[in-house]
C-alpha cells in the first residue's frame, strides 16, 4: 500500500496536500482498496464553502456507495472533472491523477489537526 510522506491524512482515510496556498484533497490508497472498483464520483460544486466533517460528495464502487467528507473547512476552487468520465483514476492513482477537489481559504487549525503519514500508519495498524 502506498503512503506518501509529504501528505497529511485523516482517520477517515482522506489525504490533504498543500499546493501554493490551496489544498488538494483525495482518498487514500487504503480507502480505494477497501471500496474496490470505483464506477462513479459525485463532486461538490466549485464555489461551495465546505465545513470540516461535512459530507461533500460520494464515491460509488461495485461494492458500495461511500460519502466523502471535508477534511478541513474551506472554499472549493476546483474539482477533478476528469473523474466524471474516468472515476477509476482514484483506484489507479489516488494521490495524483485521482485527486478529487482543491480548497482555498482553509482554516489553519484544521490543517494542524491532520495526521502525519506516520500517525496515519498507526491508524491502519
Curated annotation (Swiss-Prot):
Entry keyword set: Lipoyl
Pfam families in alphabetical order: GCV_H
Any one annotated GO CC term: cytosol
Source species, domain of life: Bacteria
SUPFAM superfamilies to which the protein is assigned, alphabetical: Single hybrid motif
Cofactor needs: (R)-lipoate
Domain (Lipoyl-binding): residue spans on this chain: 22-104
Cofactor binding comment, as recorded: Binds 1 lipoyl cofactor covalently.
InterPro entries documented for this protein: 2-oxoA_DH_lipoyl-BS, Biotin_lipoyl, GCV_H, GCV_H/Fam206, GCV_H_sub, Single_hybrid_motif
A biological-process GO annotation: glycine decarboxylation via glycine cleavage system
Chain positions found as N6-lipoyllysine: 63
Family: Belongs to the GcvH family.
Function of the protein: The glycine cleavage system catalyzes the degradation of glycine. The H protein shuttles the methylamine group of glycine from the P protein to the T protein.
Assembly, per entry: The glycine cleavage system is composed of four proteins: P, T, L and H.
Name the record gives this protein: Glycine cleavage system H protein
Protein species of origin: Listeria monocytogenes serotype 4b (strain CLIP80459)
Gene: gcvH
Amino acid at each position: 500500500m502506498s503512503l506518501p510522506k509529504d501528505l497529511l491524512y485523516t482517520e477517515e482515510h482522506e489525504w490533504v496536500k498543500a499546493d501554493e496556498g490551496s489544498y488538494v484533497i483525495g482518498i487514500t490508497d487504503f480507502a480505494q482498496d477497501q471500496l474496490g472498483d470505483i464506477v462513479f464520483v459525485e463532486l461538490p460544486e466549485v464555489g461551495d464553502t465546505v465545513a470540516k466533517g461535512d459530507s461533500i460528495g460520494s464515491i460509488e464502487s461495485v461494492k458500495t456507495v461511500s460519502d466523502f467528507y471535508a477534511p478541513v473547512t474551506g472554499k472549493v476552487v476546483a474539482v477533478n472533472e476528469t473523474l466524471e468520465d474516468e472515476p477509476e483514476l482514484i483506484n489507479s492513482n489516488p494521490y495524483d491523477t485521482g485527486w478529487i477537489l482543491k480548497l482555498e481559504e482553509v482554516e489553519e487549525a484544521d490543517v494542524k489537526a491532520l495526521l502525519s503519514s506516520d500517525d496515519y500508519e498507526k491508524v491502519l495498524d
